[in-house]
UniProtKB/Swiss-Prot annotation:
The keyword Nucleotide-binding applies. One of its GO terms (molecular function) is aspartate-ammonia ligase activity. It catalyses: L-aspartate + NH4(+) + ATP = L-asparagine + AMP + diphosphate + H(+). HAMAP family: AsnA. Pfam families: AsnA. It is found in: Cytoplasm. The lineage of its organism: Bacteria, Bacillati, Bacillota, Bacilli, Lactobacillales. Gene3D superfamilies: Bira Bifunctional Protein, Domain 2 (3.30.930.10). This is Aspartate--ammonia ligase.
Amino acid sequence: MKKSFIHQQEEISFVKNTFTQYLIAKLDVVEVQGPILSRVGDGMQDNLSGTENPVSVNVLKIPNATFEVVHSLAKWKRHTLARFGFNEGEGLVVNMKALRPDEDSLDQTHSVYVDQWDWEKVIPDGKRNLAYLKETVETIYKVIRLTELAVEARYDIEAVLPKKITFIHTEELVAEYPDLTPKERENAITKEFGAVFLIGIGGVLPDGKPHDGRAPDYDDWTTETENGYHGLNGDILVWNDQLGSAFELSSMGIRVDEEALKRQVEMTGDQDRLAFDWHKSLLNGLFPLTIGGGIGQSRMVMFLLRKKHIGEVQTSVWPQEVRDSYDNIL
């Protein structure tokens, strides 16, 4: 049992270390330290889809403030790029750990404990557009494939990803599969192509509903791009044979500028957020234009090692019935 446990841990470390090295080199970012707590009221917390309640923390020696365990570092990263004067084309990545206790379900792919490569870059002049988003997606996908090939060479786990990732807009997807749910659409398109970047998540589609929820103040999901489509964000999805479904590895996007922020908070009824320090800084032009996202570490390891449950590659909390159903839960 000990031998198996140690081997399991070595595999996990190999995937994480290999991916980190490739990501830093190919995306041209520096690894930095990030926070676990966010001060309530400064607007730095990531509100995700807007329904999740963060873990609240009181610090004994700072009695006049309340803190929350971060959901992600989407806003902190942009603030940090501005604070330390990162130039165009430069960026950072954080080995982020977070808690999301309001997950709808604790299942094969969802855990209370979240670990991500949380990255952000300053956009070069004139490149706040769909072409640059796609270029960045292709870079990250190359990192995923290089890591998969390294895993194949070391552990004899056959590489399955296609050489190229396929791009499709959510508007195209709902037109192609009008009778399917968003998740069913993802399954259909990802099974066909193997790896997909789904563009434009957060805005209302022609069927009257968004593909999925997104907070209004980090990704730009409203800017018109091409052919009447909208959104400068999206998800990297791969086909997971172990689960028989599409599998999200990353959510990312070009971040809101002043106009997109004002437009999106009005659409979601979150204008009160504009009173936060972070949002004021953005509206006053103090932040650079950026692109960023999160790449799930445990999800990446789970996929590349062909595991059936995320609990096989991370230590978290699970209902007893989950532990009873899977022998290799950590």
